[in-house]
């Protein structure tokens, strides 16, 4: 059987994902491919925060989470977003099971020292529950919330970071980060932008310094590098289409492929 594939679905892509994307997942599952989905929910969270008159704040692409924001994040991620994804997968013919990083202390975290409020730094990703779900023939759909070791505190975790930690803990073959852009975009001499088809850890650090990679793409590539450093073979940043997903799983050159080192020879 092929190695595990972890798919991270960005919040900005959620409403744009076509039925064919979920049908592709169902098809892969039917072929024996083990798939784990980790999802965000940024726009839906921002919409709910707006309704309760809380202004969203971000630092380097990471959400600042006060106690009131945390309650909204938990409600939106574990409630509406997680179950909406499970429903869409079910409608497409897949078998899916929704959980969060809180369940079974799947994502064990401590509060970050950074000025981000109730945001956690993952100390351990326990894959007991996701593996049990996979063994039963389901796709685990994981909301990126985490819990303290004593179970008393809940922390928000950036979905890219959570996906990277989960992929590493599962020794996944691929981590696919689905976004609303076709990959890392690099400015060209004629003023246009082109997709970076392949890149390395060193090149990514250079693109961050040169501000080619900015905003929400920063935690994506940092999570990618963390996952690669912990044994994940390949990270791909691509669009949420059936064609891109199936292409990546088939080993085709799609989006931006990130490896620790890239041989251009």
UniProtKB/Swiss-Prot annotation:
Pathway(s) this gene product operates in, as recorded in its UniProt entry: Amino-acid biosynthesis; L-arginine biosynthesis; N(2)-acetyl-L-ornithine from L-glutamate: step 2/4
GO annotation, biological process: arginine biosynthetic process via ornithine; L-arginine biosynthetic process
Keyword NAD attached: no
Gene3D superfamilies, sorted: Acetylglutamate kinase-like
Residues holding substrate: 41-42, 63, 156
Pfam families on file: AA_kinase
Any one GO cellular component localisation term in the record: cytoplasm
Catalysed transformations (reactions): N-acetyl-L-glutamate + ATP = N-acetyl-L-glutamyl 5-phosphate + ADP
InterPro entries assigned: AceGlu_kinase-like_sf (IPR036393), AcgluKinase_fam (IPR004662), ArgB (IPR037528), Asp/Glu/Uridylate_kinase (IPR001048), Glu/AcGlu_kinase (IPR001057)
Compartments (UniProt record): Cytoplasm
Site positions for Transition state stabilizer: 8, 220
Molecular-function annotations in GO: acetylglutamate kinase activity; ATP binding
UniProt-listed HAMAP family: ArgB
Family designation: Belongs to the acetylglutamate kinase family. ArgB subfamily.
Protein name per Swiss-Prot or TrEMBL: Acetylglutamate kinase
Gene it is expressed from: argB
């Amino acid at each position: 059987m092929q190695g595990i594939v972890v798919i991270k679905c960005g919040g900005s892509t959620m409403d744009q994902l076509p039925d064919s994307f979920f049908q592709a997942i169902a098809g892969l599952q039917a072929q024996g491919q083990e798939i784990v989905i980790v999802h965000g929910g940024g726009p839906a969270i921002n919409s709910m925060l707006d309704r309760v008159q809380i202004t969203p704040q971000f630092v380097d692409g990471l959400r600042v989470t006060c106690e009131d924001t945390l309650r909204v994040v938990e409600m939106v991620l574990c409630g509406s977003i997680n179950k909406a994804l499970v429903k869409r997968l079910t409608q497409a013919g897949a078998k899916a099971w929704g959980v969060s990083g809180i369940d079974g202390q799947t994502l064990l975290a401590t509060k970050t020292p950074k000025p981000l409020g109730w945001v956690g730094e993952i100390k351990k990703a326990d894959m007991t529950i996701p593996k049990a779900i996979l063994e039963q023939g389901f796709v685990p759909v994981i909301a990126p919330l985490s819990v303290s070791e004593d179970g008393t505190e809940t922390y928000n975790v950036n979905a890219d970071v959570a996906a990277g930690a989960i992929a590493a803990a599962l020794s996944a073959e691929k981590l696919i980060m689905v976004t609303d852009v076709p990959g890392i975009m690099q400015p060209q001499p004629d003023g246009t932008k082109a997709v970076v088809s392949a890149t390395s850890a060193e090149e990514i650090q250079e693109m961050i310094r040169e501000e080619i990679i900015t905003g929400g793409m920063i935690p994506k590539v940092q999570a990618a590098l963390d996952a690669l450093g912990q044994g994940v073979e390949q990270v791909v940043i691509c669009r949420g289409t059936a064609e891109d997903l199936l292409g990546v799983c088939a080993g085709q050159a799609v989006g931006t492929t990130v490896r620790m080192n890239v041989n251009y020879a």
